[in-house]
Amino acid sequence: MKLKFSVIAVVLMTVYGVSKAQEDNVWKKLTGVTYEVGEDEYGELYLPVFSEDIQELEGTEVSAEGYIIPFEGMFKPEHIILSSLPLAECFFCGSGGPETVMEVMMADPIEYTSKRVKVKGTLKLNAKDPEKLMYILTDAELVL
């Protein structure tokens, strides 16, 4: 009986560990994007080409930790931009690439904070609409 309990405990801890590792590595997976040059009515643009690992995440619930980008006068508590990098290094302000940010559509409004936050929602990939970011999290909830 004791051995059976030990085996079950090890299996549960392993499953939790794998799940937690995948959750923590979502930003790492999202860096597996490449680009191809395309054109629209305004000229050349770079279109994302998502790796198989990224495509497998589409439509699944993922968690992402990061920093809310504070667009002055534009912060909407139900629609935020989340950066995997601190503000000084983010895509809009520093050296990060477009794969380091995602649009997050919150299920409930949140308050702005300069501290790191964690959100959970359904990942959508965007390769066609240049007015939106390529990663969009919908029905998101604040976890931390």
Walk through the language-model features, giving the residues of each.
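Sec-dependent N-terminal signal peptides
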Residues: 5-15
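OB-fold and OB-like single-stranded nucleic-acid-recognition modules
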Residues: 20-144
